[in-house]
UniProtKB/Swiss-Prot annotation:
<dbReference type="InterPro" id="IPR008228">
    <property type="entry name" value="UCP006173"/>
</dbReference>
<comment type="similarity">
    <text>Belongs to the UPF0260 family.</text>
</comment>
<dbReference type="Pfam" id="PF03692">
    <property type="entry name" value="CxxCxxCC"/>
</dbReference>
<protein>
    <recommendedName>
        <fullName>UPF0260 protein Sama_1927</fullName>
    </recommendedName>
</protein>
<dbReference type="InterPro" id="IPR005358">
    <property type="entry name" value="Puta_zinc/iron-chelating_dom"/>
</dbReference>
Amino acid sequence: MEFWKTKRLEELNPEEWESLCDGCGKCCLNKIIDDETDELYYTNAACKLLDRDACHCRHYSERFTFVPGCAAITPDNIASLTWLPDSCAYVRLFQGRDLPSWHPLVTGSKEAMHAAGMSVKGKAVCETKVRYLEDHIVLWPLKDVD
């Protein structure tokens, strides 16, 4: 049986925890919070460390050195990371839902995720090329497809 169906998040070992990440890259997108409404908006401006084709961090093990504001996702803080998309495996499992049909642990590769449009592949730009984040607000990362 799949480990994510038999263990609680806090019971996962580091390898299992890391494997839950589908590598979509959505958590690496810059977000904006509206000052008046507190509404969260995603942009297509990705962290400078994100490889936008492979959808993974170029310096994952040193990311906190390069980007001090980068957030580590842990079982202890998942409830407070309200900016994570609903499609995030950590969020889904925290909410008592299963992994989606396109998840790499289910399919064996990232291709189904990319084909379902659930990653930032081909959709993001580097944050260093962006002048005004407000001009880069997008809606596509928010959908959740099973």
